[in-house]
């Protein structure tokens, strides 16, 4: 990563001229502002243990608490790592939960790597907090367990805007982002009347938080409601301890929710940093190329398959462009005996054949009156 981001050290200080979207050339100072990664990679980049938070100094046993902790400081962390590398053994190395990894971000200008980490709605909220924890805990509370929950999912009324889980949810092994969202829409109705009212309030607080986190545009009011939902989660979570379905909330994904509102304020809406969109690339660039080979020396075979597939796609794009501009004949034109009578008829009737013309759509009614 240090070699990959080395050009940012120069352009981050001196800048470079770039053509902007409006056509004007401006001097731009490019910096590392966002880093999208899963939790293990975030801890590796932050040079901290996976039992600690990569963004703040919360203690390893207090990640389930709603209390705020001091954020990590990049300059101080880099200095502690340097001292440890020289054998000085600073006490902060252990107290801050660091590990001996060379930080590639130490000399990047105008960068705070700990504030670059962005929330991951797909893995942290949809899959982690909701599905792996609150759905599992709620299912254990229901009399009859997963069988009763499946029966209730099957009994849900059908609606055009809602997905009907006709086989329940216990047999689904691979979930997509859309399936998580569809389950969140109806889960409160599924457990209504089957669990304690306090469980419903806790699940509702989680769903409210996830809904606000998915907003494409935020206001101060939406952020306040999001923070209020987060507070409601901590106020109602103890019901799961009382019912004995969980042993605690010292969970990294549970603690990560405290950083969502600050991330929105610093980076904007979180939909642009969600890993749900690139998750589909695992199929296109990993699973499909792997299955295309014989599983031996699969790395080289996958690279060859992807390069050939890319070449085929580029050639296909060229053929589309060439046909659209009349460089090569389309099917059913020159050289096609079946199309010759139709072409003669059009010439005889005076029809004009136009190739490579661009079409434009005009609004039926003007946007602004004269």
Task: Map each language-model feature to its residues.
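Domain-level detector for long, ordered catalytic/regulatory cores in large eukaryotic signaling
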Residues: 1, 5, 9-186
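Terminal interaction-prone segments of large eukaryotic proteins
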Residues: 88, 99, 107, 120-370
């Amino acid at each position: 990563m240090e070699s990959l981001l080395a050009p940012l050290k120069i352009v981050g200080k001196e800048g470079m001229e770039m053509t902007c979207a409006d056509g004007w050339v401006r001097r731009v100072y490019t910096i590392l502002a966002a880093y999208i990664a899963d939790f293990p990679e975030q801890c590796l980049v932050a040079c901290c243990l996976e039992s600690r938070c990569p963004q703040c100094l919360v203690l390893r046993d207090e990640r389930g608490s709603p209390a705020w902790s001091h954020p990590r400081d990049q300059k101080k962390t880099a200095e502690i790592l340097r001292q440890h590398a020289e054998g000085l053994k600073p006490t902060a190395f252990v107290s801050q939960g660091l590990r001996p990894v060379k930080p590639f971000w130490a000399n990047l200008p105008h960068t705070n790597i700990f504030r670059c980490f962005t929330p991951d709605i797909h893995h942290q909220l949809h899959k982690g907090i909701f599905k792996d924890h609150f759905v599992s805990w709620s299912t254990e509370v229901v009399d009859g367990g997963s069988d009763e929950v499946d029966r209730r999912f099957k009994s849900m009324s059908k609606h055009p805007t809602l997905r009907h889980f006709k086989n329940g949810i216990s047999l689904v092994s691979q979930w997509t982002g859309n399936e998580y969202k569809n389950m969140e829409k109806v889960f409160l109705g599924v457990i209504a009347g089957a669990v304690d009212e306090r469980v419903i309030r806790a699940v509702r607080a989680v769903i409210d938080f996830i809904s606000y986190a998915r907003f494409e545009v935020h206001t101060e009011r939406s952020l306040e409601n999001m923070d209020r939902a987060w507070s409601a989660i901590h106020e109602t979570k103890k019901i799961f301890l009382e019912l004995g379905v969980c042993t605690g909330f010292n969970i990294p994904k549970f603690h990560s929710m405290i950083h969502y509102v600050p991330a929105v304020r610093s980076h904007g809406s979180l939909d642009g940093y969600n890993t749900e969109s690139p998750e589909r690339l695992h199929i296109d660039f990993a699973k499909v190329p792997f299955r295309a080979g014989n599983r031996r020396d699969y790395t080289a075979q996958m690279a060859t398959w992807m390069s050939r597939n890319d070449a085929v796609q580029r050639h296909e794009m060229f053929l589309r462009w060439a046909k659209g501009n009349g460089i090569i004949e389309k099917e059913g034109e020159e050289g096609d005996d079946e199309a010759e009578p139709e072409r003669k008829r059009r010439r005889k009737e005076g029809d004009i054949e136009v190739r490579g013309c661009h079409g434009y759509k005009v609004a039926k009614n003007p946007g602004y009156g004269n």
